[in-house]
């Protein structure tokens, strides 16, 4: 029997599996499996409706489900699912870039900024945040008892999707 040839890594990132680490792919696979309620290998409107119901959100509008499914170029199998996440994440700035933006407001390098100050900056500068966006940010990343926002953790979560252990 002839020796097996090693698979070449696809250059230029066109292979969606090369965009993620193996552990990330496994996590996406687990999420896909949970969402594929009828276990047919595809996520469709019925699967999405069942997933929302399992999360306690009932009465999801059919139009909303259709819009979600339409985001895919075709039937949503695991590869399409992974590709969709890859495309969404591709535009995310690297963690260091986001950290550097926050460091402008933290010349002493403490790793935190007064929440009131960052709120003022985000609501008054170019690309203004709405009050609702500020509320969402502080709901997800509440300031500490001293009123400081831990921007290092915020940056980590923005770029990695989960808090550091």
UniProtKB/Swiss-Prot annotation:
Keywords: Calcium, Metal-binding, Methylation, Motor protein, Muscle protein, Myosin, Repeat. This is Myosin regulatory light chain 2B, cardiac muscle isoform. It holds the Pfam family EF-hand_6. It comes from the Eukaryota. The N-terminus is blocked. N,N,N-trimethylalanine, found in other myosin light chains would not have been detected in the N-terminal tryptic peptide in PubMed:7319048 because it would remain trimethylated and ninhydrin negative after hydrolysis. Ca(2+) binds at residues 36, 38, 40, 47. The lineage of its organism: Eukaryota, Metazoa, Chordata, Craniata, Vertebrata. SMART domains: EFh. GO terms for cellular component: cytoplasm; mitochondrion; myosin complex. This chain binds calcium. GO terms for molecular function: calcium ion binding. It comes from Gallus gallus.
């Amino acid at each position: 029997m002839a020796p097996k040839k090693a698979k070449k890594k696809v250059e230029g990132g066109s292979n969606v599996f090369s965009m993620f680490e193996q552990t990330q792919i496994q996590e996406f696979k687990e999420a896909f499996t949970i969402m594929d309620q009828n276990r047919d290998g595809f996520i469709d409107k019925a699967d999405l409706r069942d997933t929302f119901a399992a999360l306690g959100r009932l009465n999801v509008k059919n139009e909303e489900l259709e819009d979600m499914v339409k985001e895919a170029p075709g039937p949503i199998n695991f590869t399409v699912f992974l590709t969709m996440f890859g495309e969404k994440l591709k535009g995310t700035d690297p963690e260091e870039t986001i950290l550097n933006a926050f460091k402008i407001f933290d010349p002493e390098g403490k790793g935190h900024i007064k929440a009131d100050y960052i709120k003022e900056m985000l609501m008054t500068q170019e690309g203004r945040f709405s009050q609702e966006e500020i509320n969402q940010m502080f709901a997800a990343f509440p300031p500490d008892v001293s009123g400081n926002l831990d921007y290092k953790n915020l940056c980590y979560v923005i770029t990695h999707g989960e808090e550091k252990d």
